[in-house]
């Protein structure tokens, strides 16, 4: 029996006969005709869950205009003048920890505008 003859025989079968054929093939060869489950959806959800939600803003270098940077650090953190100066003078130091990505980007932009070098981790 050729492949074409098998296809013709299957074309002429009723739905009930096809169902019986599938069951017989599953039993004979130890396979299943069930559609494979797509695992990629679960993997994507896992990757999204692992995405970082809290970021630390690290002042890497106070830059040449430290007075401007100290003012911005005070504005962002509420630190006193001495504490802000110590933070800027002793880099690298975290300015803010555990903030959202948006807030971290805003803080980075303000500090870089004042002349500092900033990292987000």
Swiss-Prot record:
CDD domains according to UniProt: Ribosomal_L7_L12 (cd00387)
Alphabetical keyword list: Ribonucleoprotein, Ribosomal protein
The keyword Ribosomal protein belongs to this UniProt entry's keyword annotation: yes
Signal peptide: none
Any Gene Ontology biological process: translation
Database matches in Pfam families: Ribosomal_L12 (PF00542), Ribosomal_L12_N (PF16320)
UniProt GO MF annotations: mRNA binding; structural constituent of ribosome
The keyword Ribonucleoprotein is assigned to this record: yes
Coiled coil region boundaries: none
Superkingdom, taxonomy of origin: Bacteria
Cellular component per GO, a single term: cytosolic large ribosomal subunit
SUPFAM superfamilies hit by this protein: ClpS-like, Ribosomal protein L7/12, oligomerisation (N-terminal) domain
Described function: Forms part of the ribosomal stalk which helps the ribosome interact with GTP-bound translation factors. Is thus essential for accurate translation.
Assembly: Homodimer. Part of the ribosomal stalk of the 50S ribosomal subunit. Forms a multimeric L10(L12)X complex, where L10 forms an elongated spine to which 2 to 4 L12 dimers bind in a sequential fashion. Binds GTP-bound translation factors.
Family membership noted in the UniProt record: Belongs to the bacterial ribosomal protein bL12 family.
Protein name: Large ribosomal subunit protein bL12
């Amino acid at each position: 029996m050729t492949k074409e003859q098998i296809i013709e025989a299957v074309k002429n079968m009723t739905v009930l006969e096809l169902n019986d054929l599938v069951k017989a093939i599953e039993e004979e060869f130890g396979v299943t005709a069930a559609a494979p489950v797509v695992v990629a959806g679960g993997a994507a959800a896992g990757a999204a869950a692992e995405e970082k939600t809290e970021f630390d803003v690290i002042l890497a270098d106070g830059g040449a205009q430290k007075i401007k940077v100290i003012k911005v650090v005070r504005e962002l953190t509420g630190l006193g003048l001495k504490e802000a100066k110590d933070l800027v003078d002793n880099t690298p130091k975290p300015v803010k920890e555990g903030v959202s990505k948006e807030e971290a980007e805003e803080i980075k932009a303000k500090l870089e505008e004042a002349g500092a070098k900033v990292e987000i981790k």
